[in-house]
Amino acid sequence: MNNSINHKFHHISRAEYQELLAVSRGDAVADYIIDNVSILDLINGGEISGPIVIKGRYIAGVGAEYTDAPALQRIDARGATAVPGFIDAHLHIESSMMTPVTFETATLPRGLTTVICDPHEIVNVMGEAGFAWFARCAEQARQNQYLQVSSCVPALEGCDVNGASFTLEQMLAWRDHPQVTGLAEMMDYPGVISGQNALLDKLDAFRHLTLDGHCPGLGGKELNAYITAGIENCHESYQLEEGRRKLQLGMSLMIREGSAARNLNALAPLINEFNSPQCMLCTDDRNPWEIAHEGHIDALIRRLIEQHNVPLHVAYRVASWSTARHFGLNHLGLLAPGKQADIVLLSDARKVTVQQVLVKGEPIDAQTLQAEESARLAQSAPPYGNTIARQPVSASDFALQFTPGKRYRVIDVIHNELITHSHSSVYSENGFDRDDVSFIAVLERYGQRLAPACGLLGGFGLNEGALAATVSHDSHNIVVIGRSAEEMALAVNQVIQDGGGLCVVRNGQVQSHLPLPIAGLMSTDTAQSLAEQIDALKAAARECGPLPDEPFIQMAFLSLPVIPALKLTSQGLFDGEKFAFTTLEVTE
């Protein structure tokens, strides 16, 4: 928990204080009073009866003593339960394929009033210009959009080609920005553990803020060393005992449930009354189809309550107050005097049925957000421009030669997990000794003209066709999976022609494609339109075989070297346990 930065975020003038105090004392008129409401008590459990009094962007009072207080406007909550606005503790908005403006439109009416965002996806493509755009969006947003300064661009030095650097000097230029809460996930945990000075310099520079971690499966002395360096949290835990050990050693645990990485079922049993202040909820990567059909943080709260029997006040605590405290945002996370009036009114607290949302003391209207979206996006000056510096490819670019009797490494996918297994398969004149092997390739897209890095993929479920994308963490080169070189080339050429995007090919034809004109990562379409296009993509992909629930998000992580066990970058096959490149053919 970091309390040293509270002064940065609780901006209130002396005049505002005097007005707020006057309303609290009952000597002045409130802007809004919410009547006929019960407030969920996140500290003691149970509920508090009585109105919520709002002056400006803050809560001036709570409780029955304000029943007859005067207000410019009264809101009848019709018996609703009031809870603090939801907070996502760690996400990459780019992974939703929505701009920050569109993301706000899609999620704020669902009660997501605050996000802690690491924009390292766009920073990997276009460097500081990408971070600057996110900062502009955050400055104008109604949603509280806070930024962690991206720490590992690229994710692992020397392992991949990305589009830009983000130097310590550039990082420091953003450290004191009012929307910055700390240093984003330190993915090079072997470098931190070994004491690499360049990484320790970054940690030292941001030590007075919050230092995000990233250490899937780490334990023993290595985990102790990583925490000793100052890392405060981790969102990559996927096993119960792993999460328990991190909590025991003083880490805060972010329980992640995204579109590909689904760790809530494994980790939710850890949450209890004692450790809930150290537990938070995050999505990391969640696409607009799931947001539209299932929800965002609201969906995670619902599952904690319905599937894991987490008490109401604890479920809502880990979705708000715990995260606010961890990031030093002490003006958020509680419905109490002096706190920012980020309020979610629920007609059913167990089902997380959102009736109305207020943020910074003002009611949110979904239709108004939608109507203003285009103008607000233009005002943010998005960094348009083609970032795909790659010529069209041919089938011969994906030709691999295999020798009968030889054994070859296979990246084995685990559906709905980011980790993979490293297995092998023997080749014969009839093919491989398992029938689920596809081809995978990663093509550098930043003008270095490297030959495609090629490998083998098992367990993905692709029986025919090809899938290609320019969303491939974290360097966002072109990744393609296919059963034939010809269809792989067709899919790659479509995303090149689109200036970035996603594509499904089957029967020698493009079945569906989605252009992503901002950095090859984001669309400028509305959330509804984007969800419909993703629905069409998923339907086309399902025709290719029994793929993961979110095939494109799962595919995007097959090139991320900082998550074990075997990955493919633009430089070749990478062993994520030894942190070293390896060969396609097994020779030892």
Curated annotation (Swiss-Prot):
One of its GO terms (molecular function) is catalase activity. Keywords: Hydrolase, Manganese. This is Adenine deaminase. Optimum temperature is 60 degrees Celsius. NCBIfam families: ade, PRK10027.1. SUPFAM superfamilies: Composite domain of metallo-dependent hydrolases, Metallo-dependent hydrolases. The keyword Manganese applies. Optimum pH is 6.5-7.0. InterPro entries: Adenine_deam, Adenine_deam_C, Amidohydro-rel, Metal-dep_hydrolase_composite, Metal_Hydrolase. Belongs to the metallo-dependent hydrolases superfamily. Adenine deaminase family. Homodimer. It comes from Escherichia coli (strain K12). GO terms for biological process: adenine catabolic process.
